[in-house]
């Protein structure tokens, strides 16, 4: 197996593209692909300030590295969720992230949820006792809220997350099987800013998980290998497995599935519900001022306020 570009021994074969690369040309290919997606969806420019959500995992550190190498002004945000019960997931991932930023001289903001709000994510979830043992929904809510808040407070032009093609295809699969039209109308990789909400972009939306892992390993990025202990047995992981089976039989399946969705979205197949600015101004959280659909407090303030 030889590199398509230089004829040297290849270290990776991308079956769905039917190409192989040596280390150097694979890393270059990843940067080119990411830049292409940024341009294709008009995500952001080099003059804008970006806030990258980093977890210490392969996807977010690879993305941050690529954005930095491409010359984007990308700062990192790490949220310490306080998930240390089964392994040291949060403490270890905080350390990987800190070292990554330090080695490159990048700006990293870290927030310890427990220090800030008095409870870790598992503690918040246990208190709210919604009949679920896992804290994933509370965790998602807190992460979305704080990422948005810190981006707005820091006057960033866009929030950047490292959702890869496997993540997007698995969400899509779940949303299609449940016919969640509401979600299907919102899964575009670029969501423009609206009242109270920062712009959100996903530059890895066409990058396979395997590729972002290979990028991290081949470029010597130290990242946390363990997953969040609560992700075990999740629907998202199960859907990823199903899609991997399809991909094994039909290389390129995930790409086709995702790009087909984007075409359908563009053709108006799903309602793209963008709340109008006036509507968002109507109701504001009494505590934090965020637009909210409920009276009084927003869901985040209700969760941390109890
Ligand atoms: Fe949030 Fe696992 S519960 S990362
Ligand atoms: Zn090569
Ligand atoms: Zn609020």
Where on the chain are the PLM-derived regions?
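Flexible helical/loop "lid" subdomain adjacent to adenine-nucleotide binding pockets
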Residues: 39, 166-170, 174-204, 209-212, ...
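ATP-dependent adenylation/nucleotidyltransferase module used to activate substrates
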Residues: 2-185, 194-197, 209-219, 285, ...
